[in-house]
């Protein structure tokens, strides 16, 4: 595999990383060829179809469509997003515990075929609902919350626009830091101390800005709506009591399959900076390490390859340690501290949007029928607080200077 940083010290196009939006899909396609109008109609009208109880019947009446008319990457990504949203809506219904355990063949077959082609599991992942689910309202204006919208949501008032777009804007803010990565490796190769120092401080600054963007979640996402509505539609069927064996993809696999729901663990951004800084999140074989390793299977293959390629580059941490240079150590630590701050903030968000609403549920609602059985779990199926605390702790332990 080619190194992420080839001799030109740019990030190779094969990794699908955009200069402006990073791991997000730049300018996603908004419409599929007319051949797929029936899919698009359902996806565009999910809130009405779910509310009226017609969604499942509409899905069951669909004709089986070939994926052969999806000829380019952007149309394939849009079709995956469309089929993923329809699948989540079909499985979880109105979100009150009436669950479907079999995905009809007319949707399961094209969805699985397309997923196989894109090397992603047939479930709605972060790369679908966040990275490919957006548009600019005015193409000539900047990428701000006010000038953006999502392509699809599940229910009216589910805060999906806020949740997906703020997540996307954090990704976009971090894209500025990704651009600096080639400079880091070039500076190490050329032994240019000042260039490396400046690059590390630039990465830290970009990650600090990403944290500021994260604050927007309070303006656009309501904890009750997230907990009781959106969270359910993002839940998967791995380790989920409601689909204890997984989901049957009729006509494609005979046995049910288990897949994790979409989660921030599927974002390549934070894994990318862990790898760059030599923070050993996936070492040690603990639950958190295993989960993060598993989540790579839920990332687009180009991004998985980028992470692998980064891992094969020389270690920034070892280089900084070998120099015995206080300035470099401080710059390295500034990057680590920025990641620690982001992870601490994520813990606060989980407390506000999951733990507190879970504790406020009326007792009669706390049944095993909660679709994501999630009291303290994330949509990816992890015990969320313990997982995030482990990840933050591993990050903190990577600081070169105590305190």
From Swiss-Prot:
* Cellular compartment(s): Cytoplasm, Cytosol
A single GO BP term for this record reads: positive regulation of interleukin-12 production
Indicate, by first and last residue, each region the UniProt record lists as having compositional bias (Basic and acidic residues): 363-376
Q: How is its activity regulated?
A: Activity is inhibited by and MTH-trp (methylthiohydantoin-DL-tryptophan), modestly inhibited by L-1MT (1-methyl-L-tryptophan) but not D-1MT (1-methyl-D-tryptophan).
* Catalytic function, reaction form: D-tryptophan + O2 = N-formyl-D-kynurenine; L-tryptophan + O2 = N-formyl-L-kynurenine
* GO MF term list: electron transfer activity; heme binding; indoleamine 2,3-dioxygenase activity; metal ion binding; tryptophan 2,3-dioxygenase activity
Quote the cofactor binding remark.
Binds 1 heme group per subunit. In the active form, the heme iron is in its ferrous state Fe(+2). The catalytic cycle does not alter the oxidation state of the heme, but IDO1 is prone to autoxidation.
> What InterPro entries does its record include?
Indolamine_dOase, Trp/Indoleamine_2_3_dOase-like
Q: Name one GO cellular component term.
A: cytosol
Q: Which cofactor is essential here?
A: heme b
Task: Write one Pfam family the protein is assigned to.
Answer: IDO
Q: Which UniProt keywords apply?
A: Cytoplasm, Dioxygenase, Heme, Immunity, Iron, Metal-binding, Oxidoreductase, Tryptophan catabolism
According to its UniProt entry, what is the function of this protein?
Answer: Catalyzes the first and rate limiting step of the catabolism of the essential amino acid tryptophan along the kynurenine pathway. Involved in the peripheral immune tolerance, contributing to maintain homeostasis by preventing autoimmunity or immunopathology that would result from uncontrolled and overreacting immune responses. Tryptophan shortage inhibits T lymphocytes division and accumulation of tryptophan catabolites induces T-cell apoptosis and differentiation of regulatory T-cells. Acts as a suppressor of anti-tumor immunity.
* Record's subunit section: Monomer.
Name of the protein in question: Indoleamine 2,3-dioxygenase 1
UniProt source species? Homo sapiens
Taxonomic classification, please?
Eukaryota, Metazoa, Chordata, Craniata, Vertebrata
């Amino acid at each position: 595999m080619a190194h992420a940083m080839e001799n030109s010290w740019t990030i190779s196009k094969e990794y699908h990383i955009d200069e402006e939006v990073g791991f997000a899909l730049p300018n996603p396609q908004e419409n599929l060829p007319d051949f797929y109008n029936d899919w698009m109609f359902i996806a565009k009208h999910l809130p009405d179809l779910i509310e009226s109880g017609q969604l499942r019947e509409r899905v069951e009446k669909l004709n089986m469509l070939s994926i052969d008319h999806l000829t380019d990457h952007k149309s394939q990504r849009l079709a995956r997003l469309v089929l993923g949203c329809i699948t989540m809506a079909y499985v979880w219904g109105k979100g009150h515990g009436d669950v479907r355990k079999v995905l009809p063949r007319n949707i399961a077959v094209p969805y699985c075929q397309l997923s196989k082609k894109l090397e992603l599991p047939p479930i709605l992942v972060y790369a679908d609902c966040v990275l490919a689910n957006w548009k600019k309202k005015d193409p000539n204006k900047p990428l701000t919350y006010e000038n953006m919208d999502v392509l699809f949501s599940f229910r009216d008032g589910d805060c999906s626009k806020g949740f997906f777009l703020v997540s996307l804007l954090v990704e976009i803010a971090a894209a500025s830091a990704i651009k600096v990565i080639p400079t880091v490796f070039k500076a190490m190769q050329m032994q240019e101390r000042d260039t490396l120092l400046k690059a590390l401080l630039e990465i830290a600054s970009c990650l600090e800005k990403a944290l500021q963007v994260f604050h927007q979640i309070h303006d656009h996402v309501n904890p009750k709506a997230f907990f009781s509505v959106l969270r359910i539609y993002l839940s998967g069927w791995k380790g989920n009591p409601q689909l204890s064996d997984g989901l049957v993809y009729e006509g494609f696999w005979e046995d049910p399959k288990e897949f994790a729901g979409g989660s921030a663990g599927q974002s390549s951004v934070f894994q990318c900076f862990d790898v760059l800084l030599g923070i050993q999140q996936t070492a040690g074989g603990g639950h958190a390490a295993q989960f993060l390793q598993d989540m790579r299977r839920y990332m687009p293959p180009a991004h998985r390859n980028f992470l692998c390629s980064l891992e094969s580059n020389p270690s920034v941490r070892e280089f900084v340690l070998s120099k015995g240079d206080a300035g470099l150590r401080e710059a390295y630590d500034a990057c680590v501290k920025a990641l620690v701050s982001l992870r601490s903030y994520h813990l606060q968000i989980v407390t506000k949007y999951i733990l507190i609403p879970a504790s406020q549920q009326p007792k009669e609602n706390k049944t095993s029928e909660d679709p994501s059985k999630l009291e303290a779990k994330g949509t990816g199926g992890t015990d969320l607080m313990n997982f995030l605390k482990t990840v933050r702790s591993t990050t903190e332990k990577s600081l070169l200077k105590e305190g």
